[in-house]
Amino acid sequence: ASRQIDSFIKWAKKQDWYTNTTIAVMGDHEMMAAPEIVGFANNEMTHYWLNFFINPVKTTERRKRFFSSLDFFPTILESIGAEIPQGALGLGRSLYSNQPTLLEKYGKDSIDNVLKKRSVEYDYFLYYKKGKK
């Protein structure tokens, strides 16, 4: 997969639209590599997800964040120049903002417990049959 990404990026760089295009690469599984390659010192991590943006409109100095896939929605939109009030959309927090993600604010266990709960509203939209009231 990494060779395919490399090939695509090299091809994209030759296209007229490249400088006006943001490429978002989102990992879908853990990878192993030397920690210093992705900015971790002293072997503090050996397995991690690799997510990165090429040519984002915005940049950030904050590198190490605790985030989930919920945070990709506002982050991707801000990476292409969208203005998001308070840096939040739905349950996601833009990683370009100074807003803490839900994982940073509440922790993984707390978020997992809340998301496992039953939602009457979700059940209504999932199971509601037209004509029944």
Regions found by a protein language model. Give the residues of each.
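A generic fold-level signal
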Residues: 18, 44-46, 90
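Active-site lining segments that contact anionic ligands and/or coordinate catalytic metals
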Residues: 20-21, 26, 46-49, 67
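Amphipathic alpha-helical segments in well-structured domains
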Residues: 2-5, 48, 69
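Alpha-helix capping and helix-loop boundary segments enriched in small/acidic/polar residues
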Residues: 39-41, 63-64
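Flexible glycine/proline-rich, aromatic-decorated loop/lid segments
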Residues: 40-52
